[in-house]
Amino acid sequence: QYINGCRFPCTIFIQNMQAKNDEHYRLDVKDNYITISGGTPHAIFNGTQTLVSLLKKQTIPAKLENIAINDYPDLLYRGMMLDIARNFTKKADLLKLINQLAAYKINVLHFHFSDDEAWRLEIPGLEELTAIGSRRGFTKDESQCLYPVYYGGWNPNDTTATANGYYTREDFIEVLQYAAKRHITVIPEIESPGHARAAIKAMEARFNRLKGEDMEKAREYLLSESAD
């Protein structure tokens, strides 16, 4: 109902076609109808994104010239890496980014959530990873938070600072599902054995918490030795 210039209203058809790959689509704008053709849901999604991009700068009701677009990627892996370890990205902003990746037909999000500077993903049963590893601020011994780096303020309890924050298990599931609906694969990265200082310090804190109760359990996830 928002497209004219072709004996308004305009009908949109979805059509199957033989394609070069799973993302190959064809978009045809005719006098009184639009056809999006593809061999997979991903292809149809890409065609829809192109149609949306054509409409974005239009006023409503929009007018499109007749056009035929035959499009497919030469590179099947088109990715972006997002580093939320050094500076945290809130979930709402990440979802906006995923929408933009979909608009540009980027199909992989490399999710870098752990590094020396922070650990940003909740792991049930290993609370110190986020209780300590996701916060930076003033500290003498890093028993409650990590040293401040990549300026994010000095207060480990400031939830507005880019130094602090993490994704809960539920947050991460939501991100995965949100991306999947937009045909984006999320590849989470756990940095190891190098660039693992946040996890190392978090597991040292876990060790110190449990060593008086159960030494075997305390050492279970310890990532360092006392002589290191």
Predicted regions span which residues?
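Aromatic/hydrophobic pocket-lining residues that form the small-molecule binding cavity
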Residues: 44, 94, 168, 172
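Aromatic/hydrophobic pocket-lining residues that form π-stacking "cages" and hydrophobic walls in ligand
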Residues: 97, 175, 186
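Long, well-ordered, tryptophan-enriched scaffold segments
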Residues: 183-187, 193
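Short, solvent-exposed loop/turn and secondary-structure capping segments
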Residues: 47, 92-94, 112-113, 120-125, ...
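Aromatic- and acidic-residue-enriched carbohydrate-binding clefts of CAZyme catalytic domains
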Residues: 117-181, 196-228
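A conserved hydrophobic secondary-structure block that centers on an alpha-helix together
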Residues: 80-116, 120
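Contiguous, structured surface segment used for ligand recognition
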Residues: 1-77
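Short, well-ordered coil/turn segments that N-cap beta-strands
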Residues: 75-78, 105-107, 180-184
